[in-house]
Amino acid sequence: MKYDVIVLGSGPGGYVTAIRASQLGFKVAVIEKENLGGVCLNWGCIPTKALLKSAQVFDYLKHASDYGLSVSSFDKDFTAVVGRSRGIADGMSKGVQFLMKKNKIDVIDGFGKVKPGKKIDVTAADGKVTEYTADNIIIATGARSRELPNLPQDGVKVIGYRKAMTLEKQPKSMIAPPPFFTGSVNQCRNSGEQPISLGPRCPSIMTTFRIVPKDFSSLTICHILA
């Protein structure tokens, strides 16, 4: 099938581009192998902030007297907290699906592989491969997590961000390596903010050659120690 524009990836960069292209009169398709909305809506920005909000409300309750309120009893339900987060993510993804339908954008389910000649092979879940062509192909695939060398994710002691977002039981402690702190954000804090505690200890690890902000990148360790 032939399109004016094919967008590979349905994250914030992809679906917004697709909508605008459709509004300008182009025949548009979006290729997505998972849920519409990409990592941001399904596993990153949106659900982590939902978890943070639950943690914030819990923190407010612990300090209710500071606001002139008296709360006799309260507790956290970790399963419900995670369930709320996943529900919000699902709702946002369905919202993107509605926008695709509203703007008459075809959604092609499968894994897309760009080929020469402005062609894309899409492999569906059943293994069937279909070729699509377009005058313009926009790659908006984003990124994926990378395992640390010699430290594979076993799903128990070492977990990825998706597992961290769907834990059935709250861990007593966890460590989140850089560059992104999704693992710790979804439990107790946001990078740069004060801890908002739901319980676990969340130390952060930084790996860098500088101990000053990037704004001062001209400074080296030699300058600092001089």
Locate the predicted segments by residue.
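Beta1/beta-strand and adjacent pyrophosphate-binding region of the FAD-binding site
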Residues: 1-11, 172-176
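Hydrophobic residues within membrane-embedded alpha helices
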Residues: 6, 41, 49, 134, ...
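N-terminal Rossmann-fold NAD(P) dinucleotide-binding loop
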Residues: 14
